[in-house]
Amino acid sequence: MIDFGNFYSLIAKNHLSHWLETLPAQIASWQREQQHGLFKQWSNAVEFLPEIKPYRLDLLHSVTAESEEPLSAGQIKRIETLMRNLMPWRKGPFSLYGVNIDTEWRSDWKWDRVLPHLSDLTGRTILDVGCGSGYHMWRMIGAGAHLAVGIDPTQLFLCQFEAVRKLLGNDQRAHLLPLGIEQLPALKAFDTVFSMGVLYHRRSPLEHLWQLKDQLVNEGELVLETLIIDGDENTVLVPGDRYAQMRNVYFIPSALALKNWLKKCGFVDIRIADVSVTTTEEQRRTEWMVTESLSDFLDPHDPGKTVEGYPAPKRAVLIARKP
């Protein structure tokens, strides 16, 4: 069973202590009532993983752990089998004692695009909204963050995160909670808040921006990464039934429209840091994620369009400050 006690003990001693007024009851309710039917199977995979203290740990350039002496073929096979029980792996990659988890997304490429535009993360307390398996949280720690807290209600991601954490020597500098942002009080406690790949899934994108702002300290930094389309400050795509085969895509603004949304929500110093077309090299099927991926969602005769005829995925990173 996944235990959140270490996190409670950690925040009891810092400026997040007021979160303890609501968080333990929320987690207890989730443990009683909301667990996925496969959660026991996934958590067993985590439990059966060996506890290893890495001799070499690299979170700055990748998420890589190595032992002083190479593991035996049997040990490597055991780790690989247990990690495969947690498929599909969408966000990564991870290199753990000779087991290379080639995830659907090259999340390291996104991090390389984002990192040069961030304020120095050294010593910061960070919230990662919709953090997936937690890959970017480990990279935040590698960049000097004091604490990275991720929230994501997808329970497979929680188990993937806990599996990686165990293989990183039970590292307590990052924590994942199975919650959505709407379940968080206005903590106003994080130096940097990341929301990457979330906004277009929200029925009310401006409400999401307000929720992000409510988590930031004054002068805190928002890092927003989302789908965009080309156009002026009034351009917003509202897809029909699906976009790139996803049903839960509601609003895709232009980067300029998104700047206006952020301004309307009270953010300042707003800048478009990066715009990139998503390629089939960055998002693709692998042996760790064997179902459909981006190439299946694009028009086979025109890769500049989705199968529905919309512009193919393009993403922007915007940076803003809460005054």
From Swiss-Prot:
One of the record's GO molecular function terms: methyltransferase activity
EC number, as in UniProt: 2.5.1.-
TM ranges: none
Binding site residues for carboxy-S-adenosyl-L-methionine: 91, 105, 110, 130, 152-154, 181-182, 196, 200, 315
Keywords assigned by UniProt, alphabetized: Transferase, tRNA processing
EC class: transferase
Keyword Transferase: yes
Subunit and partners: Homotetramer.
PANTHER family: METHYLTRANSFERASE, TRNA U34 CARBOXYMETHYLTRANSFERASE
Protein name: tRNA U34 carboxymethyltransferase
